[in-house]
From Swiss-Prot:
Record function comment: Large subunit of the glutamine-dependent carbamoyl phosphate synthetase (CPSase). CPSase catalyzes the formation of carbamoyl phosphate from the ammonia moiety of glutamine, carbonate, and phosphate donated by ATP, constituting the first step of 2 biosynthetic pathways, one leading to arginine and/or urea and the other to pyrimidine nucleotides.
Key words of the record: Amino-acid biosynthesis, Arginine biosynthesis, ATP-binding, Ligase, Magnesium, Manganese, Metal-binding, Nucleotide-binding, Pyrimidine biosynthesis, Repeat
Binding site for Mn(2+) 2: E299, N301
Residues noted as binding Mg(2+) 3 in the record, renumbered to the chain: Q826, E838
Catalytic activity: hydrogencarbonate + L-glutamine + 2 ATP + H2O = carbamoyl phosphate + L-glutamate + 2 ADP + phosphate + 2 H(+)
Gene name for this UniProt entry: carB
Pathway: Amino-acid biosynthesis; L-arginine biosynthesis; carbamoyl phosphate from bicarbonate: step 1/1; Pyrimidine metabolism; UMP biosynthesis via de novo pathway; (S)-dihydroorotate from bicarbonate: step 1/3
Coiled coil: none
Entry protein name: Carbamoyl phosphate synthase large chain
Co-factor(s): Mg(2+); Mn(2+)
CDD domains: MGS_CPS_II (cd01424)
GO cellular component terms attached to this protein's record: cytoplasm
Manner of cofactor binding, per the entry note: Binds 4 Mg(2+) or Mn(2+) ions per subunit.
Annotated stretches, region: Oligomerization domain: 403-547
Taxonomic placement: Bacteria, Bacillati, Actinomycetota, Actinomycetes, Kineosporiales
UniProt organism field: Kineococcus radiotolerans (strain ATCC BAA-149 / DSM 14245 / SRS30216)
Length: 1104
């Protein structure tokens, strides 16, 4: 069946900001869909609030709306654009829930718009727990015994029938949000209460516990002619009880018997047919009881999911691309396989290698959070590796996570066997390491299985690794056979060096002298049965190399590895742009990365893709392989964040050509003393600072500067380990618990600028001329990490004279450091002094936002500058505007606001309360959104709607502010009262309001408890949903504790919470704008990026 001719335009709904459970994989799937649909000649309209995505680039769709993904906004877009169809299966749970809401409130019918990809009935059958249970039974399969509940009374009755422990699973949520295992009634009340709150239909399913069973997933696709393919089987290394996104997973499944696998396939195919997914993909999860082989169907996602992205990268079978084609009418046998070019998509992929995915966590950012892994997903990213066997893939994947202590180590004593077995029984992110240490301590396979319920086959592979490590350590000499044997099982040069007490580079020298190097195999979807036309490679210590020679010069781009807090999809965005720009300029582009979620690891983003860990050893081998294939013009390290930057100096020492800013210049900007001299020569000032490698040193510096001070380790990204310290006792505590402090790695002590305006600048420099990308003003004051602060382009309160000072200072720094490419500088403006906080000669996390706000692709331009072009040439080519730059935008240009999205609701302490939502100098956001409109209040309002679901326009606001903020709060709070809000406040705050003629009611503090006549405390009232908005600025440590309870309650019920006065002023402006809009009867204003850019260009022309 060829493509439907009745469809002319399609609205694709994206997934919004990156949050835990819904990450970059949806940018990857959405980007693929937009490309395919446009190639089919359809007009593509896209809505997505996340500016850090490739899919929101103006060239990916005909109309790109960077707007909040809410039913009201999407309705406004449908009313304006009148698409024939809506495709919602590629934007995760956000897109699905929005599409269902539009269907149910009649919007789709009103505008004659069809839902394609999966119909509402199929979505409901797959997502509604009770209906899905019926589907499974009709297919002759089993699901776990369960009860569907809509209230706490039903929950308690259900648990009484099933017996503890029970699993709680809310309907229509994502990444296991609100789910968990309840071992007793207290657990059940807490978890089910959360689940009922997070489920949009207030519904949870209670299930019998299948803890300890084996967990599998199948990724399937079906078309309207009823062809079904099983793309991939995936097995979880951890047994049931850990969310699949937090588990180490392996493809293909390793421990199934053929009969079990066939049974699972049969069930999967029956289920996808019964649910009625007939134009796309789905993912089905199974549990298998290891005692008797009983198979239970756990759940299904009738859409593209995190596992689909993994399955796509693992097999080379592009699920999202094919799903988009099926949605517009094609069948599987009509769609060609891109990789082989000679087989159709109805051929099931075959794997002749093993794929392992390892999650990456961020518990160090939330020290109070409980690190136990449960059914609520907590990982923030993942790394994937391919190998010829399980052990090779596993060891490569572990070192790809770039986490200290993630790889197996055989150094030192393993510890007590009984203690290790006890600790390994609890699933945490360190469990696999504990298993290896228990093996070293003499634990038997039976004891380990009893403790962890990890399948004996996987445990046996771990024993094999321990045996090989023993051979390497104990043999008289490192023979070529032994070295090759260890490398075939994934041992790195560093691990072999540790076992032999040799430095890593000596091991590498020996290995190269013996001619032992990896070969590169190809992912071809068909186990080499047909030739592959796309070079998608992985390394292995095998015999035959499959890389091909080439004539053109290549540029190697090092990606950013697994997503983590502080280094997210924004850096991947810059790498992808560089690949596109350099390919257009006539180079062959080579991408090295190990993150399966991203666009950079799509096989058609660059000319060659190496799915490899970003370690010195692996990168050197890739560069060597590419130099064998043809000329290499250089390697780009400044786009992938801190990971590739950290390799720059060592790569250069090894003779690898680094293009762009030199490693020496990178060091110059990072090293305080040298950078201080650059500033001095330019006549610029930094806040007073010093470096210390001991507490007495730090104490002396702090005394000289005066408290508060900002302390942090050198060389970090995302403010890791930073703290604002108010007194000497806290400083001593920090120095005692900080990361390893040594003369090589000193701690930096800075003056902390209270009440300063923070300014962020992204610029390009070619050695002669500077192009200012954009000047952003932060809404929160300095001291909150720039990645967590909201920021605005053009800056709303800076005058032309200040902007001119910022421009001159940025250019002086670019010249002084010797930048070629991108530069990010952070300034603080305090008492009319412009302080330089830091300069980073690399792509920053604001590059995508600035590019979207100003309509200029900065990362593309930067890649060309690194390859030797000048800014003048790029202006002539049209890659940069012919005149002017982002530092002086026209007066009537649209205002863009970037807001950070924080994951506090996911993390709980061991007692089950949420971790504190206070912001500070350590970055904790996982993603971002953008609001864009004609003025600041409306744009800020949109950013809040996109990030947290919006600000209220009526109701009760609770106010409790620190003494230092009491003067500044009066005007915004008075405005709130004038707008009709009811105010409640703590006693001290209420008194100040009363003196200024503002009426408020005093509420009971949390520490006072509920009164005898039943008056709730503020925490109780927030929990009961009586408070529409919380304003709570913290002061000192004691008040922080009372404030913590208030903020935790607000986080738990999803009330907007404001913790700084600057944010309060912005919020009040946004609320007023929304009320005015409502009064005037106006709906939501929506405009596409293409329209904004056209307006901006017209304004530039008008200036000329």
């Amino acid at each position: 069946m060829p493509r439907r001719t009745d469809l002319k335009s399609v609205l694709v709904i994206g997934s919004g900001p990156i949050v835990i459970g819904q990450a970059a994989e949806f940018d990857y799937s959405g980007t693929q869909a937009c490309r395919v649909l446009r190639a089919e000649g359809l007009r593509v309209i896209l809505v997505n609030s996340n500016p850090a995505t490739i899919m929101t680039d103006p060239e990916m769709a005909d109309a790109t709306y960077v707007e909040p993904i809410t039913p009201a906004v999407v309705e406004a877009i449908i009313a304006k654009e009148r698409p024939d169809a809506v495709l919602a299966t590629l934007g995760g749970q956000t897109a699905l829930n929005t599409a269902i809401a539009l269907y149910e409130n009649g919007v789709l019918e009103k505008y004659g718009t069809e839902l394609i990809g999966a119909d509402v009935e199929a979505i409901k059958l797959g997502e509604d727990r009770q209906l899905f249970k019926g589907v499974v039974e009709r297919c002759g399969a089993e699901s776990a015994r369960s009860h569907l509940c809509h209230s706490m009374e039903e929950v308690l009755a259900g648990a009484a029938d099933l017996g503890y422990p029970v699993v709680v699973r809310p309907s229509f949520t994502m990444g296991g949000l609100g789910s968990g295992f309840a071992y007793d009634e207290a657990d059940l009340r807490r978890i089910a209460g959360q689940g009922l709150h997070h489920s949009p239909v207030t519904e949870v399913l209670l299930e019998e516990s299948i803890l300890g069973w084996k967990e599998y997933e199948l990724e399937l696709m079906r078309d309207r002619a009823d062809n079904v393919v099983v793309v991939c089987s995936i097995e979880n290394f951890d047994p049931m009880g850990v969310h699949t996104g937090d588990s180490i997973t392996v493809a293909p499944a390793m421990t199934l018997t053929d009969r079990e696998y066939q049974r699972m396939r049969d069930i999967g195919i029956a289920v996808i047919r019964e649910v009625g997914v007939d134009t796309g993909g789905c993912n089905i999860q199974f549990a298998v009881n290891p005692e008797d082989g009983r198979i239970i169907v756990i759940e299904m996602n009738p859409r593209v999911s995190r596992s689909s992205a993994l399955a796509s990268k693992a097999t080379g079978f592009p699920i999202a691309k094919i799903a988009a084609r099926l949605a517009v009418g094609y069948t599987l046998d009509e769609i060609p396989n891109d990789i082989t070019s000679s087989t159709p998509a109805s051929f099931e992929p075959t794997l002749d290698y093993v794929v392992v995915k390892v999650p990456r966590f961020a518990f160090e950012k939330f020290p109070a959070a409980d690190p136990t892994l449960t059914t609520t997903m907590k990982s923030v990213g993942e790394a994937m590796a391919l190998g010829r066997n399980f052990t090779e893939a596993l060891q490569k994947a572990l070192r790809s996570t770039e986490k200290r202590g993630a790889t197996f180590s055989w150094a030192g004593e393993p510890g007590d066997r009984a203690d290790l077995l006890r600790r390994a029984a609890q699933p945490t992110d360190e469990r696999i390491g504990l298993v290896m240490q228990a093996i070293r301590a003499g634990a038997t396979p039976e004891e380990l299985f009893e403790s962890t319920r990890i399948d004996p086959w996987f445990l046996d592979q771990m024993f094999l690794l321990d045996e090989i490590a023993g051979e390497v350590r104990d043999s008289d000499e490192l023979t070529p056979e032994l070295l090759r044997h260890a490398k075939r099982h994934g041992f790195s040069d560093a691990q072999i060096g540790e076992l032999r007490h040799l430095p890593e580079d000596v091991v590498r020298g020996v290995r190269h002298a013996l001619g032992i190097r990896p070969v590169y195999k190809t992912v071809d979807t068909c186990a080499a049965e047909f030739a592959a036309s796309t070079p998608y490679h992985y390394s292995s210590y095998d015999e035959e190399d499959e890389t091909r020679p080439r004539e053109k010069a290549a540029i190697v781009i090092l990606g950013s590895g697994p997503n983590r807090i502080g280094q997210g999809v924004e850096f991947d965005y810059s790498c992808v742009h560089a690949s596109f720009a350099l390919r257009d300029a006539g180079y062959e582009t080579v991408m090295v990365n190990c993150n399966p979620e991203t666009v950079s690891t799509d096989y058609d983003t660059s000319d060659r893709l190496y799915f490899e860990p970003l370690t010195l050893e692996d990168v050197l081998e890739v560069v060597h392989a590419e130099m064998r294939c043809g000329p290499v013009a250089g390697v780009i390290v400044q786009l992938g964040g801190q990971t590739p930057l950290g390799l720059a100096a060592k790569l250069e020492q090894a003779g690898v050509p680094i293009i762009g800013t030199s490693p020496q210049a990178i060091d110059l900007a990072e090293e305080r003393g040298a950078f201080g001299q650059v500033l001095e020569r330019a006549g610029l000032v930094a806040p007073k600072h010093g470096t210390a490698s001991s507490f007495p040193g730090a104490k002396a510096i702090a005394a000289g500067i005066g408290y508060p001070v900002l302390v942090r380790p050198s060389y970090v990204l995302g403010g890791r380990g930073m703290q604002i310290v108010y007194d000497e006792a806290s400083l001593e505590e920090y120095m005692r618990t900080a990361t390893e402090v040594s003369p090589e790695r000193p701690v930096l002590v800075d003056r902390f600028l209270d009440d300063a305006i923070e300014i962020d600048v992204d610029a390009l420099f070619d050695g002669e001329e500077m192009y200012l990308g954009g000047i952003m003003e932060h809404i929160e004051e300095a001291g909150i990490h720039s990645g967590d602060s909201a920021c605005v382009i053009p800056p709303p309160t800076l005058g032309n004279a200040e902007l001119a000072r910022v421009r001159a200072a940025t250019e002086a720094i670019a010249r002084g450091v010797g930048v070629r490419g991108l530069l990010n500088v952070q300034f603080a403006l305090a008492a009319d002094v412009l302080y330089v906080l830091e300069a980073n000669p690399r792509a920053s996390r604001t590059v995508p936002f600035v590019s979207k706000a100003t309509g200029v692709a900065l990362a593309k331009a930067a890649a060309r500058l690194m390859a030797g072009t000048s800014i003048r040439d790029l202006r002539a080519e049209g890659l940069l505007p012919g005149r002017g730059d982002g530092g002086l935008l026209p007066a009537d240009s649209p205002v863009s606001v970037k807001e950070a999205v924080l994951p506090f609701a996911r993390f709980r302490t061991a007692e089950g309360v949420v971790v504190d939502s206070l912001l500070g100098p350590e970055m904790r956001s996982t993603g971002e959104v953008m609001g864009i409109d004609v003025d600041f209040p409306t744009a800020f309002g949109k950013s809040q709607t996109a990030a947290y679901g919006g600000l209220p326009t009526a109701g009760t606001a609770f106010i409790s502010v620190a003494d230092r903020d009491k003067r500044a709060m009066i005007f915004p709070i008075k405005r709130l009262a004038d707008l009709g809000f009811t105010l409640v406040a703590t006693e001290g705050t209420a008194q100040v309001l009363r003196r200024n003629g503002i009426t408020s009611t005093v509420v009971r503090k949390h520490s006072e408890g509920t009164s005898e006549d039943g008056e709730l405390t503020i925490v109780g009232r927030i929990g009961a949903g009586e408070i529409a908005m919380v304003v709570n600025t913290p002061s000192g440590n004691q008040a922080r504790a009372d404030g913590y309870e208030i903020r935790a309650a607000a986080t738990a019920v999803g009330s907007p919470i404001i913790t700084t006065i600057q944010e309060l002023s912005a919020a009040v402006q946004a609320i007023e704008a929304a009320i005015v809009q409502e009064r005037n009867g106006g709906g939501v204003n929506v405009a596409s990026l293409q329209e904004h850019t056209a307006r901006l260009n017209a304004a530039w022309e008008g200036r000329a």
